[in-house]
Amino acid sequence: MLIPFSMKNCFQLLCNCQVPAAGFKKTVKNGLILQSISNDVYQNLAVEDWIHDHMNLEGKPILFFWQNSPSVVIGRHQNPWQECNLNLMREEGIKLARRRSGGGTVYHDMGNINLTFFTTKKKYDRMENLKLIVRALNAVQPQLDVQATKRFDLLLDGQFKISGTASKIGRTTAYHHCTLLCSTDGTFLSSLLKSPYQGIRSNATASIPSLVKNLLEKDPTLTCEVLMNAVATEYAAYHQIDNHIHLINPTDETLFPGINSKAKELQTWEWIYGKTPKFSINTSFHVLYEQSHLEIKVFIDIKNGRIEICNIEAPDHWLPLEIRDKLNSSLIGSKFCPTETTMLTNILLRTCPQDHKLNSKWNILCEKIKGIM
């Protein structure tokens, strides 16, 4: 059963609330099941942060359901250039988010369910949560062969991944979140989670590719709504709480004071890209010049998402050394992103001799450089 989460039926989840108590009026004795009415990845991730930072979960576990419009979510210690096709994401208007938990990269859309299990640090148990999901799936379709693995994934028929896991453990609280593939766009998923960038050297956490499958392909009755209700029922029975899914608005400051600032932080370039572990790119590409292919070599060091070292090598007869040196020096300290590179190269182009052939070569080189960003 869905219940709107409004000021008239708010819940006091803390005995010693660390935020203004205006957002929560009544006391929850055993636990709570929430569902976001938002499909914005940043707003929903902010709910996780808020609950983790502000709620006393002693004896009051929380299950949080949320779904996002098409988005790619990378782990806390991952490199987006290594994990996904950023150029395709920009073309398609797909959001990129970096979560605060570890783990690998996932694709979200409205055919995917996200589940977050909040507990105290002492009660944190990923395997128990996954077993709960398996029981819920078997309750609605006993013929399903779903098993939890040692890597805390859920496999369908022993080979198809339908759920991936990540977690965050704080000083006193913890959460485990996972996906559940119902009717996700598999073609889009595989295209977006395939990096086209070559020559990346990084110590960032790398995702492990897996075969995936939607539950709806196995049984067309297994819709997102059916699955969420099944998991909620099993969760309520396990924790002996009311089987009610309470709808929340993750932008409501009366319920979650300060939550919008958390969502804004998650959208910043400094968080999404700037938190990428230091990496380098050592690659090359070819350009056509007078019916022959010339090789352009590129070596770039990136730290905190900004170019620290830049060395672009091209034949002198194709592009003068002086111009290449200007390009190398101008990019140092800039964001490793096509928008800022476009701005810098346009400014630099104005200082170059107004020569049609030279400008054409310059544009070709700059487009190639932006293509690896």
Swiss-Prot record:
Gene3D superfamilies: Bira Bifunctional Protein, Domain 2, CO dehydrogenase flavoprotein, C-terminal domain. Its main location: mitochondrion. Residues 1-25 form a transit peptide. GO terms for biological process: lipid metabolic process; protein modification process. Residues 57-243 form the BPL/LPL catalytic domain. Keywords: Acyltransferase, Disease variant, Mitochondrion, Transferase, Transit peptide. Pathway: Protein modification; protein lipoylation via exogenous pathway; protein N(6)-(lipoyl)lysine from lipoate: step 2/2. GO terms for molecular function: lipoyltransferase activity; N-acyltransferase activity. It comes from the Eukaryota. It catalyses: N(6)-[(R)-lipoyl]-L-lysyl-[glycine-cleavage complex H protein] + L-lysyl-[lipoyl-carrier protein] = L-lysyl-[glycine-cleavage complex H protein] + N(6)-[(R)-lipoyl]-L-lysyl-[lipoyl-carrier protein]; (R)-lipoyl-5'-AMP + L-lysyl-[lipoyl-carrier protein] = N(6)-[(R)-lipoyl]-L-lysyl-[lipoyl-carrier protein] + AMP + 2 H(+). Highly expressed in skeletal muscle and heart, moderately in kidney and pancreas, and detected at lower levels in liver, brain, placenta and lung. One of its GO terms (cellular component) is mitochondrial matrix. Its EC number is 2.3.1.200, 2.3.1.-. InterPro entries: aa-tRNA-synth_II/BPL/LPL (IPR045864), BPL_LPL_catalytic (IPR004143), LipoylTrfase_LipoateP_Ligase (IPR004562). (R)-lipoyl-5'-AMP binds at residues 107, 151, 161, 179. It holds the Pfam family LplA-B_cat. Lipoyl amidotransferase that catalyzes the transfer of lipoyl moieties from lipoyl-protein H of the glycine cleavage system (lipoyl-GCSH) to E2 subunits of the pyruvate dehydrogenase complex (PDCE2). Unable to catalyze the transfer of octanoyl from octanoyl-GCSH to PDCE2. In vitro, it is also able to catalyze the transfer of the lipoyl group from lipoyl-AMP to the specific lysine residue of lipoyl domains of lipoate-dependent enzymes but this reaction may not be physiologically relevant. NCBIfam families: lipoyltrans. Belongs to the LplA family. This is Lipoyl amidotransferase LIPT1, mitochondrial. It comes from Homo sapiens.
